[in-house]
Structures are given as C-alpha cells and as structure tokens.
Amino acid sequence: MISRPISQQIYSNLNRVIPGGVNSPVRACANMGQIPMIIDHAYRDTLVDVDGKTYVDYCGSWGALIHGHAHPSILEAVQQRMKKGTSFGITTSIEGELAQEVIKLIDSVEKIRFVSSGTEATMSAVRLARGYTNKEFIVKFNGNYHGHADFFLVQAGSGVLEVSPSASSAGIPADIVKQTLCLPYNDIEACRQIFHHSDYRHKIAAIILEPIAGNMGVIPASQEFMQFLRKETLAMGALLIFDEVMTGFRVALKGAQDIYPVEPDLTCFGKIIGGGFPAAAFGGREEIMNLLAPLGSVYQAGTLSGNPIAMEAGLQSLRLIQQPGFYEELHRKTDLLLNPIKETIKKNNWPICIQQAGSMFTLFFCKNRVRNLEDALKANTTIFANFFRKLFDQGIYIPPSQHEAWFISQAHEESNLIKTQSAILTFLEENF
C-alpha cells in the first residue's frame, strides 16, 4: 500500500470536525481497507491528491464530468458569469436558456424545474405525482437509488406479497415508509401481483425507477420490463417517473430515452446537467408541471435553485455533448478499454461479468449476468476490495464499491486507457 502521510493527517483532522471525515459515506472507502483520497486538484482525466500522487479517474464526480475535469470552455464561461454575481435568489435569463436546451433534447419534457441536487429532484417529482394523481403509494425497486429522502430509504419485505416495508436508515418513522412499495427490479410477474392487488391497484401515484440502474452496478431494465411498467401505469392512472440523474445525457444524447421506446411522464436529471456544479432538475408534461407553485398547489422551492453559476456550467455542458461525433468518440474510448478485457474473460471462462451502457460500466466479480439486486449481491466483494487497492497503488482510481458504476469521459487519454487495461488484465491473470 502506497504511503500518503499528508492525506492521513488531513483525514485525521477532518474526523475531528466532520462525522466520519466525509460529507457522503461512500467517499470514506470504508470497505476498501484504506483511508479515502484527499484531492488537491484535477485536470482532464487525472486526479492529484494532497501527497502529489496522480490517478487516472474513473469516478468523474460520480458521472457528472462527462467532459473531464476543468474543461476550459466550462471554466471560461463560469468565470465570466461569476463577474456578474454568484447568487441572487432572483430569476435570471440563463435559467430559461438551460431549460430550453433540455426541452429541445428530451421529447418527454415540455416544462422543467431546476433544483440543487438529485435528491431534491426525485423528492419533488414524487410530491408532484401524488398531487397530480391524488394517490398516496409510490413504487420503487430494490437496488435503485433515488437519493436520501425518507420515503426512498426503504427495505423490501421478504416475499413478493410482503410489501410492508421497513426503513433502511435510523431516524425515519415507520409511517413514512408505509406508502412506499419496494419491488424486485426486472421481475414482471412479481410486480404484476402487486399492481393487480386490490389493496394497491387504485392507490399507486407513481412508479419511479432508474431505467439503467447505476447504484447497484450497471443493470439495465429489460425492454419487456419497461414496456410492462408503461402499460401498467397507464392502466392504473399512475405516473411513470424516470430517474435519469445518472443516465441523463450519459448513455446517449437523449439519455435512456434514446434506448427505450417508452416515454415517461416525469424525468429527473442531475450530474451532467450541472456541468460539475450542484444542479439538478425534474421535468415532464406541461399539464403535470403546471401544478407546481406558483401556478398550482404542489409546493417546491429552494434558495439556490437555478443558481446562475450552475446554470452556466450546465448550459456549456449540454452544448458540448451536441458536437458532431461526441458520443461516438466517447463510446470508442470505452470499447478501447473494455473489449480486450471482455474477450480475455470469455476466453478463460473467468467468473467475471462486465455490464456496460454507453460510457458507464461495472466489472462484477460473479459469473452470470446481473439482472437485479439479488444477483448483484452475489458478487465477490472481497476480491473487489483487493482489486480496488491494486489499481489504486498503480495510480488508477475507480469507485470504491463493487456496486457502483465506472465512467469514461471525453478527456480520457488513450495511453491512460491502455495503462488501465493492462493493470486490470494483470490482476485478473494473477487471481483467476
């Protein structure tokens, strides 16, 4: 394990003033057997820690940095915008510019509301769905992550019809989670039993899902499952909400809605839409969105919602992804890294599964294709922790969890992709 004395000292100091020394738990690297990274700066595809060590970055601020770190066009636009002021709590014209850009790209979005985090976006979308339908139950799926609002932090029951959930965090009253139904992802028959059950069928306000899950590893919804959900929501009078905080503008220009021939009623965005700044959004059909205050009776607000600095970064981010050949080049780089690894795994029949959606992917240490949370939990986390440390010591940073997505950016250098590929293949050859 490489020595990082300055990181160690700073982390010790952080622990005195911040719980666990981090402001989001996954950053602690708790299951990786080492202290977390402490970053000094970054550029393009490279992180530099406070000890001066460099790392090729496959986290990319958890998918937000599709253009890489410190993209010059985004930085220049943000610097010019900051000269006008940083925050007003009053409307600015750039909010409309970014809104128009999203509406132009996403067919299902007719109006949009900006917020500051993915949690705010999903939380507000659910409140809006309940207000629109005048129903109370929400359906989510095991392993899908929609932020940390109380009604999302739910554990499923032990059987298909045991839908009385329990909270997955302390501090959440039991009554809060009673109206969240947590069902198996990609399981049509299990969902059908609930959707047609007399206790729930006419009480479901919305179904929310990640069309391509990214927080239990990269796991796409099947086309059949997605079409089933759209059919059932229409029949029940419920809304279908896509959580595209991760997949939006990542897997394709139109996000997952480029991949599935299904149009949701509401979509949640984050990460790329903020260009590396704290911004997120939710949008959908005009008749639904017009229920938001001040037009309607569904309340949603935020002091920093539509912050002009974040809007500028987001606008530049979305303009960059529309350049000719952007996604073709992004996917070429991803394939350059992954294809030889996939071929070697297949040739040797190793118990490893790489699941990919465009430029996001997960390397699962398990034999069979992963379709849901139950499959994902079969992956060998001990091997993954060893894998993480081995790559880290060679200057390669991947998300510190078996059940997270990796990301390629437009800024990744081919030489760094080849370096990473070689390190991965060496580890696999030595351990399988």
UniProtKB/Swiss-Prot annotation:
GO molecular-function terms, A-Z: glutamate-1-semialdehyde 2,1-aminomutase activity; pyridoxal phosphate binding; transaminase activity
NCBIfam families, A to Z: hemL (TIGR00713), PRK00062.1 (NF000818)
Keywords in alphabetical order: Cytoplasm, Isomerase, Porphyrin biosynthesis, Pyridoxal phosphate
Annotated Pfam families: Aminotran_3
Keyword Isomerase: yes
Assembly notes: Homodimer.
UniProt superkingdom: Bacteria
Pathway(s): Porphyrin-containing compound metabolism; protoporphyrin-IX biosynthesis; 5-aminolevulinate from L-glutamyl-tRNA(Glu): step 2/2
Keyword rRNA-binding: no
Catalytic reaction annotation: (S)-4-amino-5-oxopentanoate = 5-aminolevulinate
Subcellular locations according to the entry: Cytoplasm
Family of the protein in this entry: Belongs to the class-III pyridoxal-phosphate-dependent aminotransferase family. HemL subfamily.
Cofactor: pyridoxal 5'-phosphate
InterPro entries tied to this protein: 4pyrrol_synth_GluAld_NH2Trfase (IPR004639), Aminotrans_3 (IPR005814), Aminotrans_3_PPA_site (IPR049704), PyrdxlP-dep_Trfase (IPR015424), PyrdxlP-dep_Trfase_major (IPR015421), PyrdxlP-dep_Trfase_small (IPR015422)
Residues with PTM N6-(pyridoxal phosphate)lysine: 271
Protein name, per record: Glutamate-1-semialdehyde 2,1-aminomutase
TM region(s), chain numbering: none
Enzyme class: isomerase
